[in-house]
């Protein structure tokens, strides 16, 4: 009996060790499953896209990106773009489309990007008169409601991509961005928080993302560097206003991990908020790097912290 008992105990011990070993081997797979897929906003490499659309997509995939967010199709046929994405293995996540284009012909915008295979259409930027405090701000809110309804009916989801000017407070004391989200239902409009501009506006990016838990399917990861206090219009200083050349300034977009952002805290908040995609964006190259080198640096950083 003692021999049998000893044998049973030995077998049990071996079984427990075996289970423990399997559990240890399973951990990396579980961690991998928990990682959010990472895309890139192709505005970051717009010159490369214009010069070689398909070739740039192939390079983006080779870097390790899972999907892309478009900023124009550069006269390529939407169905062809969809075919290229399938061939290369990139998810066509979303597209930034000027609000003016949506207002002019939302049916065409929807048809084009459904053909591309996008899940989301994004309002990327609004002109001054449609910003909080502008004469057309309230009209813009209603325009977005209408566009959101059209997108919903077509099986797409409308997102709004913020800058810093949406954090101007209205007479009520409410931020313009919060007013937009409180006045357009979540089933018609979701967030695409650009965390660079959230931080630049003086808010905590992770905390603000958590405020919109369940309504933030796509998050823009963007880093920047700032020397001292910014004075004047940041878009003039970085040369993003139409017709203006870039001026020397204290503000500079940076690859992820090279600026002021606490990127890990944003990624953790994205998990908690139920986000589905992280999207890398860098409006202008910096640090002596070319645009493609910048997005390469960003994804290598994400790999280094275990987020990719």
Feature-to-residue mapping (PLM):
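Conserved beta-strand positions in the central sheet of alpha/beta enzyme cores
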Residues: 69, 94, 122, 159, ...
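Active-site acidic/histidine proton-transfer and metal-coordination neighborhood
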Residues: 99-191, 292
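Acidic-and-aromatic substrate-binding clefts and catalytic sites of carbohydrate-active enzymes
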Residues: 45-51, 67-79, 97-106, 128-132, ...
């Amino acid at each position: 009996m003692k021999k049998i008992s000893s044998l049973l105990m030995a077998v049990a011990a071996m079984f427990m060790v075996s289970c423990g070993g399997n559990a240890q081997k399973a951990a990396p797979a579980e961690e991998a499953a928990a990682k959010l897929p990472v895309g890139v906003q192709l505005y970051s490499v717009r010159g490369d896209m214009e010069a070689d659309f398909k070739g740039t997509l192939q390079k983006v995939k080779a870097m390790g990106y899972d999907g892309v967010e478009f900023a124009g199709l550069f006269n390529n046929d939407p169905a062809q773009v969809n075919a290229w994405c399938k061939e290369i293995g990139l998810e066509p996540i979303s597209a930034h489309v000027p609000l003016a284009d949506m207002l002019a012909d939302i049916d065409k915008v929807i048809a084009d990007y459904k053909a591309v295979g996008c899940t989301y259409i994004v309002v990327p930027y609004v002109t001054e008169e449609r910003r909080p405090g502008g004469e057309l701000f309230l009209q813009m809110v209603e325009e977005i409601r209408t566009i959101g309804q059209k997108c919903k009916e077509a099986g797409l989801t409308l997102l709004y991509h913020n800058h810093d000017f949406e954090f101007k407070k209205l007479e009520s004391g409410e931020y313009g961005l919060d007013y937009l989200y409180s006045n357009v239902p979540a089933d018609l409009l979701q967030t695409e928080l650009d965390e660079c501009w959230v931080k630049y506006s003086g808010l905590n990016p992770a905390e603000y993302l958590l405020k919109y838990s369940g309504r933030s399917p796509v998050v823009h990861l963007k880093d920047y560097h700032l020397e001292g206090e910014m004075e004047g219009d940041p878009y003039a200083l970085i040369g993003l206003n139409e017709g203006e050349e870039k001026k020397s300034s204290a503000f500079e977009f940076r690859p992820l991990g090279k600026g002021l952002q606490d990127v890990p805290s944003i990624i953790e908040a994205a998990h908690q908020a139920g986000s589905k995609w992280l999207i890398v964006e860098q409006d202008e190259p910096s640090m002596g790097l070319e645009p493609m080198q910048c997005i390469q640096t960003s994804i290598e950083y994400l790999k280094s912290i275990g987020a990719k």
